[in-house]
Amino acid sequence: MVTVRAPATSANLGSGFDVFGAALTRPADVVTVEKAAETTIEVTGVGAQYIPEDPKKNTVGAVVEALDAPARIHIDKGVRPASGLGSSAASAAGAAVALNRLYDRGLSRSELVPIAAEGEAVVSGVAHSDNVAPSILGGFTVTTSEGTHAVDASIPLVVCLPDVAVSTRDARRVVPETASMDDLVETVGNAATLAIGMCRSDPDLVGAGMSDPVVTPERARLITGYDEVRAAAFDAGATGVTVSGAGPAILAVCRDGQRRGVAAAMLDAFSDAGIDSRAYQTRIGRGSTVLEE
């Protein structure tokens, strides 16, 4: 038996659509696997009632097939589905790391990223790695057609999750198919600034580099109260605010000592909009961790 803790993640980070990702210290899924002749999946925890246990419809089932590793699998969900925090990716990442150890497949963490991404395709329709990469590798990740690169970073964050759902498929439908040259230049410059900030663990640079004039404004329209929550976070000292992944979670970058105030401001802003929400005071952290074997 192998048990793995797989962290929630935030993808895109504003200017890095389908490229950037970051592992969060909380929340997380816990995945336990045992060898079996036939694969079965049991899901408990947050939003378990919305997650199929049929291996053909669960992200974990695709990972099992790719590794040829049938198992009894238990997923204790700490990452709510349809949250913008890489819920399906956390399960797929945890299963990939756990099954690799259980069956002694000998694959590196980097080699597990595309395998876990196949699981993501079950949910979103596309095998993207921007969530599974940080959930497996940890830190800040950059994923392109050439592969994934990761760097350790220490950036304080607040994630505010409203009690509404935005599906990845719906969020992809609103993404513009074209962008102006001015918007392209602005986005590239911001993405480069963010990447430098991550390498330096500089929350001011990271926050300054999150602005995105193309994708984020369209996705923000799907989140009631987004503009007010964003403004409240900045007023409380956040250096950058954006939609986390497909949403509805909102990510705020903070300096040390400011997370509590930023979290309270974001919660109050959602409350003023008539929406319940939960705030996680977190930071960029480790990837999937083996807890027991």
Curated annotation (Swiss-Prot):
It is found in: Cytoplasm. The gene is thrB. It comes from Halorubrum lacusprofundi (strain ATCC 49239 / DSM 5036 / JCM 8891 / ACAM 34). Keywords: Amino-acid biosynthesis, ATP-binding, Cytoplasm, Kinase, Nucleotide-binding, Threonine biosynthesis, Transferase. It comes from the Archaea. This is Homoserine kinase. One of its GO terms (biological process) is threonine biosynthetic process. Pathway: Amino-acid biosynthesis; L-threonine biosynthesis; L-threonine from L-aspartate: step 4/5. Belongs to the GHMP kinase family. Homoserine kinase subfamily.
